[in-house]
């Protein structure tokens, strides 16, 4: 039986607020310990990320993308299915140019409804095709410095 809609909604709002706040602790606050984050499309071949991997990745990413802004355009919540989808645009500054990405972010709630236990996120493929190589080169340069 799904968790009450009000509980799921509070968790969904906590997830969005954490994303908007753009701090590792805030963003991860709604994630369950076993939460998995999957990059879409599946054909991108990016392996799922565990919470433990994300806890290491986010501080690095969040220090690179500054002046982060989240604009949510649509949220659809299906309490009976314990899931929701968020369509949003994010912008930020980076050392190698502006960041502007579109996201379709699908989230699933655990049995209690108090945590997100799965995330599948579709990014703007056109933007990411140009941005990811710059991001990877920047991170590599920082690690070598």
From Swiss-Prot:
Metabolic or biological pathway: Secondary metabolite biosynthesis
Gene Ontology MF terms: monooxygenase activity
InterPro entries associated with the record: Fungal_Meroterpenoid_Isomerase (IPR050977), NTF2-like_dom_sf (IPR032710)
Keyword Oxidoreductase included in the entry's annotation: yes
Keyword Transmembrane helix: no
Broad enzyme group: oxidoreductase
Practical applications: Secalonic acids show unprecedented anticancer activities against various human cancer cells and might be interesting for further derivatization, targeting diseases such as cancer.
Enzyme Commission numbers on file: 1.-.-.-
Entry keywords, A to Z: Monooxygenase, Oxidoreductase
Function: Monooxygenase; part of the gene cluster that mediates the biosynthesis of the tetrahydroxanthone dimer secalonic acid D. The pathway begins with the synthesis of atrochrysone thioester by the polyketide synthase AacuL. The atrochrysone carboxyl ACP thioesterase AacuM then breaks the thioester bond and releases the atrochrysone carboxylic acid from AacuL. Atrochrysone carboxylic acid is decarboxylated by the decarboxylase AacuI, and oxidized by the anthrone oxygenase AacuG to yield emodin. Emodin is then reduced to emodin hydroquinone by a yet unidentified oxidoreductase.
PANTHER family, A to Z: AUSTINOID BIOSYNTHESIS CLUSTERS PROTEIN F-RELATED, AUSTINOL SYNTHESIS PROTEIN F-RELATED
Family that this chain belongs to: Belongs to the avfA family.
Name this protein carries in UniProt: Monooxygenase AacuP
Source organism (scientific name): Aspergillus aculeatus (strain ATCC 16872 / CBS 172.66 / WB 5094)
Name of the gene encoding the protein in the UniProt record: AacuP
């Amino acid at each position: 039986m799904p968790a009450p809609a009000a509980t799921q909604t509070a968790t969904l709002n906590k997830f969005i607020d954490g994303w908007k706040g753009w701090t590792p602790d805030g963003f991860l606050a709604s994630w369950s310990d076993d939460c998995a984050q999957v990059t879409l499309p599946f054909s991108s071949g990016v392996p799922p990320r565990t919470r433990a991997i994300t806890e290491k990745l986010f501080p690095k990413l969040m220090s690179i993308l500054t002046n982060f802004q989240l604009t949510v355009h649509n949220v659809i919540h299906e309490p009976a299915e314990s899931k929701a989808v968020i369509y949003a645009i994010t912008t930020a500054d980076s050392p190698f140019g502006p960041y502007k990405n579109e996201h379709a972010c699908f989230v699933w709630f655990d049995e209690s409804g108090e945590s997100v236990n799965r995330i599948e996120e579709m990014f703007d493929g056109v933007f990411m095709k140009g941005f990811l190589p710059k991001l990877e080169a920047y991170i590599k340069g920082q690690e070598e410095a």
